Amino acid sequence: MGQKGHKDSLYPCGGTPESSLHEALDQCMTALDLFLTNQFSEALSYLKPRTKESMYHSLTYATILEMQAMMTFDPQDILLAGNMMKEAQMLCQRHRRKSSVTDSFSSLVNRPTLGQFTEEEIHAEVCYAECLLQRAALTFLQGSSHGGAVRPRALHDPSHACSCPPGPGRQHLFLLQDENMVSFIKGGIKVRNSYQTYKELDSLVQSSQYCKGENHPHFEGGVKLGVGAFNLTLSMLPTRILRLLEFVGFSGNKDYGLLQLEEGASGHSFRSVLCVMLLLCYHTFLTFVLGTGNVNIEEAEKLLKPYLNRYPKGAIFLFFAGRIEVIKGNIDAAIRRFEECCEAQQHWKQFHHMCYWELMWCFTYKGQWKMSYFYADLLSKENCWSKATYIYMKAAYLSMFGKEDHKPFGDDEVELFRAVPGLKLKIAGKSLPTEKFAIRKSRRYFSSNPISLPVPALEMMYIWNGYAVIGKQPKLTDGILEIITKAEEMLEKGPENEYSVDDECLVKLLKGLCLKYLGRVQEAEENFRSISANEKKIKYDHYLIPNALLELALLLMEQDRNEEAIKLLESAKQNYKNYSMESRTHFRIQAATLQAKSSLENSSRSMVSSVSL
């Protein structure tokens, strides 16, 4: 056992941690504080001098770059963050015990005791695992963007405008990401080591042999961040992917993941704010767009409140405040929050585009097509994430204008729709799902006498689960229903064409959603069922069938008809393949299935309890 004060003093019971570790953590907390007050460059400048020597400085520096990449989804930002995170990982490796936690704790022979790790070594383990986890997260950025994120003025080059690297650079990036994604699914060694290390560290924290050191809150916060992130992410994956991962040793428990992140968020540690951000992303994006729309909004507000009080002008927290108002259906309040977010900082200028994307949808919910068009136009001119998507949205909004409305800039929706396919970003043979959807919908405009899409803006609103937003406000729902009903009447009066059945079924789906939220349950069910009845007549929009089954199942679940709902969900999952936005639909089916099964189990337990009494 080492002597107190010696550099090899044992952790956690054998001696005093090195003061440099405590000092480094304090400095990194200061840097995060600068970051959260929109002083992005200052935070990086504060950290940079020690990034080559301190693993926490290096990790924090790389984490801020990764946050930038997550906000911008720009390939250059992703590469920059990835390279810096790799350097941080190498630095952590130098501070790790020669026999790592994963190797040591997993070995059945000559297993070292806990006391053989110094505090620096045990912190190096959690930092190393975090580097691996964050590098894995970067692999998801290109394909999972929510559509509003773009490249801001780069931290390292304030004059940099929105630009994307040339083709080869994009291809190399995508290939790198694709390989990392495959390695993640197949149990690639880096992600697997991160997962295993977090599992062992979690066991360590709960062990009766474990003694808390001076910097224990920061260490424990790191463990909770990693364990929570892994469990929560894995638990959300569709069953077919989850089975592959379980086969190679991964598993995820949603409740345990949420608990770990909530405990991490409530502590006072270097990782507390990261736990908060992950939870806010989960509550305001993942469960909303990829789930059933049932969001624990009270928990999101509880998480956000102390940070919004502490950082009233913090752009990140103002953005989440806007998202919460959107989900609550308070559209005017959401608009004010997003506008306030744009005013709060100018350094990451194009971070505003995240707000523009949200503002575009806010005005869509209100049926204010000119304002929606305005933000789609801004995005199409300033944003390099997906020109095809933004031009499609411009065309979609123009097509919603009335005959008497003046169309700005002399734009014509037919020409805009025709331009969409040429703007596709094809990277290593792959396209963004939203772009694929927009391109498929635009194809009908290539004929000399094109047949217009009935309500393209309202269709895309469904793709982003916007009906769960307007459903909170009957007035908004009535307004959208009126537009859909008029479109339905026009289809009935118009001549039959090759798109007639597809368009009629689309209108039925959207109408059913409005009726559901207005409490007209029977009418909603009839509309959803009519789509399945026309399944064999649909020529192009095959995504309508599984989504109609999904929406019908959700409607039945609200009536406690969970067994019927589960059968419909199983049919939607098993019987339909290769349709638009399939992965997103599968995520929603998975969330609905888990919810229905949970309700059935709770009902069974209640019956047993009643009988026992």
From Swiss-Prot:
GO terms for cellular component: centrosome. The keyword Cytoplasm does not apply. SUPFAM superfamilies: HCP-like (SSF81901). TPR repeats lie at residues 315-348, 505-538, 546-579. The keyword Lyase does not apply. Disulfide bonds: none annotated. Keywords: Repeat, TPR repeat. It comes from the Eukaryota. InterPro entries: Iml2/TPR_39, TPR-like_helical_dom_sf, TPR_rpt. Belongs to the TTC39 family. PANTHER family: TETRATRICOPEPTIDE REPEAT PROTEIN 39 FAMILY MEMBER, TETRATRICOPEPTIDE REPEAT PROTEIN 39A. This is Tetratricopeptide repeat protein 39A. The gene is TTC39A.
